[in-house]
Amino acid sequence: MLDIKQIRENPQLVQERLNSRSGKYDIEPILQLDRQQRELEGTRSQLQARSNEIGKIVGQKIKSGINSQDPEIQALRDEGNSVKATLSELEPQEKDLKAQIAQLVLALPNLPSDSTPLGKNEEDNVEVRRWGDEYIPQNPNILPHWEIGEKLGILNVERAVKVAQSRFVALVGAGAALERALIQFMLTLHTQAGYLEVSPPLLVNTESLTATGQLPKFAEESFKCADDDLWLIPTAEVPVTNLYRGEILAAEDLPIYHCAFTPCFRREAGSYGRDMRGLIRLHQFNKVEMVKFVEPSTSFDELEKLVGNAEAILQALRLPYRVVNLSTGDLGFASTKTYDLEVWLPSSGKYREISSCSNTIDFQARRADIRFKEAGKKGTQFVHTLNGSGLAVGRTMAAILENYQQPDGTVKIPEALQPYLGREVL
């Protein structure tokens, strides 16, 4: 959530930053309501001061011996009652204005950082670096991962669709074992890098989704329970970030690093007809997530480290990838700066997103009211939160099935993964 003070004091800058994003955002209604609310607050403050003054004057006069029924005292009391009646009318009006402002501010995305490239969409994303070109397979006859998966008997779409619907898959035998090995491998590398593993709830309440920015704007993209205020998580970022919602952390405990493996659930409402086959775009998929809580002065350095932690997985698996800095037109709602890691999929000859690493600065912390306090200092500050995939497990499987495909129709297991799987080939 943006700071209303920032909107009030720098309206032109805020509007310009919002205009650089995709979508249309107008802060003028917020500014108008804010002016009304502050005027009302000023009036209420003056009336409250007058009410206090009247009470003090009446008390002094009675103390000095003037009869409480004296016309002057009675007039003061009548004025005091009138002031209190007006105050009681203004209070709900001010409360309503604050609620309206809060709802409008909740609908605004984060402001892009100065180091986020200007652009209209993903075409304007800026490539930062590539890694592993020497590992790009030269075999011209590589099958798409869903075809080789079905040939090997490790991927069954037809039966999964029978059980659920389209955009679901069932992993069988060595496929299920490969997924389990990848999850263990990723968590091991992250915990070795200093992340504390957590196993969070897979269902969260509305307040949690609002805190991380999925609600109210993206309700149609999530699965909601019909009879409860619970939603299936779209990413572990939501429950892990909300573990600290409403808390004041000690500065000496920062930074806090967490990693978590969870299934994730997304309706993919805006993706009709895209990536209908395979493991790329599913309603249910597994992912290992990294989440950080850090001091504001360190958050952009922490973003670079976060990207490095995700890259370490791809490098250990010898999977070719590139890092791109997302443009303002492709930036996620809660993020001020995002790097996407895109893995090479030879069957399509394209790089595809496998990780998204974002710095939300104080945007989520402000919505979730997560603060920290330095010892010996007054007041608190909002922490900065970061999150990143480390990695999307299904997409990592897809990349292995294609990049490690052999001419004889088998798939070699990456050397780093072999101890976790107990085999060298599928």
Swiss-Prot record:
Name-wise, this protein is Serine--tRNA ligase
Sites where the protein binds ATP: 266-268, 353-356
Keywords from UniProt, A to Z, are: Aminoacyl-tRNA synthetase, ATP-binding, Cytoplasm, Ligase, Nucleotide-binding, Protein biosynthesis
List the pathway annotation: Aminoacyl-tRNA biosynthesis; selenocysteinyl-tRNA(Sec) biosynthesis; L-seryl-tRNA(Sec) from L-serine and tRNA(Sec): step 1/1
InterPro entries from the entry? aa-tRNA-synt_IIb, aa-tRNA-synth_II, aa-tRNA-synth_II/BPL/LPL, Ser-tRNA-ligase_type_1, Ser-tRNA-synth_1_N, SerRS_1_N_sf, SerRS_core, tRNA-bd_arm
Q: Which EC number(s) are documented for this chain?
A: 6.1.1.11
Q: Which family does it belong to?
A: Belongs to the class-II aminoacyl-tRNA synthetase family. Type-1 seryl-tRNA synthetase subfamily.
Q: Which EC class is the enzyme in?
A: ligase
Gene Ontology biological process terms in this record: selenocysteine biosynthetic process; seryl-tRNA aminoacylation
In Gene Ontology terms, what is one molecular function of this protein?
A: serine-tRNA ligase activity
Q: Which reactions is this enzyme annotated as catalysing?
A: tRNA(Ser) + L-serine + ATP = L-seryl-tRNA(Ser) + AMP + diphosphate + H(+); tRNA(Sec) + L-serine + ATP = L-seryl-tRNA(Sec) + AMP + diphosphate + H(+)
Matching SUPFAM superfamilies, A to Z? Class II aaRS and biotin synthetases, tRNA-binding arm
Q: Name one GO cellular component term.
A: cytoplasm
Subunit structure as annotated in this protein's UniProt entry: Homodimer. The tRNA molecule binds across the dimer.
Annotated domain remarks: Consists of two distinct domains, a catalytic core and a N-terminal extension that is involved in tRNA binding.
Pfam families, A to Z:
Seryl_tRNA_N, tRNA-synt_2b
Which coarse location class applies to the principal site listed for this UniProt protein? cytoplasm
Localization per record: Cytoplasm
Residues the entry annotates as binding L-serine: 235-237, 289, 389
According to its UniProt entry, what is the function of this protein?
Answer: Catalyzes the attachment of serine to tRNA(Ser). Is also able to aminoacylate tRNA(Sec) with serine, to form the misacylated tRNA L-seryl-tRNA(Sec), which will be further converted into selenocysteinyl-tRNA(Sec).
